[in-house]
Regions:
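Nucleotidyltransferase catalytic core that binds NTPs
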Residues: 2-224, 231-236
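Long, charged alpha-helical interface segments
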Residues: 193-194, 227, 247-251
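A short, glycine/Asx- and small/polar-enriched loop/turn
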Residues: 240-246
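Conserved small/polar residues in nucleotide/adenosyl-binding loops
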Residues: 252-261
Length: 261
């Protein structure tokens, strides 16, 4: 596997590129993105860069899990062709991107500027690497929609593909931030998926308000601080109607408030 740190590297010499951007601390969810990329008969590039522009809290940035040596071994085992691990100088003279109004709901309500930071670094990575296809996990659904729509406007030849969320045996979505939870908190966090599944199983438009309210109450009884539990149109991220494709999203703080899910 090739390892590159310089943005000046000639990525285009490798032909069609399938790109997986990450912030490192890789897990099975990231590896599934790489598996999807390898199915495309392209040269697979994975970037590792902890982007300070998307953190609202300095402590979150400092405490974000880092495991670069282990990450490199995982990338090699997964068949990644090139690891792009830039220094923070990649941010020099960067064009700041303002996210669309779709960033004002869900996570964006409590994390102002977060998605601006995401799109700013993604725009630079796309410009540097010029991939044919880029892969993102659907766990961060709002981020996926924002990036997909941004790419449609500014990188029309780039295909953005979403990969389903990878979960552990309890149903908990795999996340680098899960490393900040102790075993008891991990067990409690499994209740998130259970409540979302109950909403899905019993869903109807005239019951959704009640189902969401009950799920929120159940989780709060366990000690969760629910930032939002919302249901929106899956494409526009606007309020639902009778013909909409619905996405149900939830953001919480664990009973020990050290992690945002």
């Amino acid at each position: 596997m090739i390892q590159v740190t310089s943005p000046e590297y000639n990525f285009s010499k490798h032909g069609d590129i399938a790109f997986v951007p990450t912030m490192g601390n890789l897990h099975e969810g990231h590896l599934n993105l790489i598996k999807a990329a390898k199915l495309e008969s392209c040269f697979v590039i994975v970037s590792i860069f902890i982007n300070p522009l998307q953190f609202n809290n300095a402590n979150d940035l400092i405490n974000y899990p880092k495991s670069i040596e282990a990450d490199i071994k995982l990338l090699e085992a997964a068949g990644c062709d090139l690891a792009f691990i830039p220094e923070e100088t990649i941010l020099n003279d960067i064009d700041s991107i303002q996210a669309s109004e779709q960033s004002n709901v869900l996570c964006g309500k409590s994390r102002p500027g977060h998605f601006d930071g995401v799109l700013t670094i993604v725009n630079r990575l796309f410009t540097i690497i010029d991939p044919k296809i880029a892969f993102f996990g659907l766990k961060d659904y709002q981020q996926f929609i924002l990036i997909k729509n941004y790419a449609t406007q500014h990188f029309p030849n780039l295909l953005i593909k979403g990969v389903p969320t990878t979960r552990d045996i309890s149903g908990l979505a795999l996340s680098s931030r899960n490393n900040l939870l102790n075993p008891h908190e991990l067990d409690l966090a499994a209740n998130i998926f259970k409540e979302l599944c109950l909403i899905k199983t019993n869903f109807s438009l005239n019951k959704i308000d009640l189902l969401a309210s009950e799920a929120k109450k159940n989780l709060e009884k366990l000690g969760f601080d629910i930032d939002y539990l919302d249901y929106l149109d899956g494409l526009s991220l606007k309020k639902i109607n009778s013909s909409t494709s619905i996405i149900i999203c939830l953001l919480y703080t664990s009973p020990s408030p050290r992690d945002r899910g």
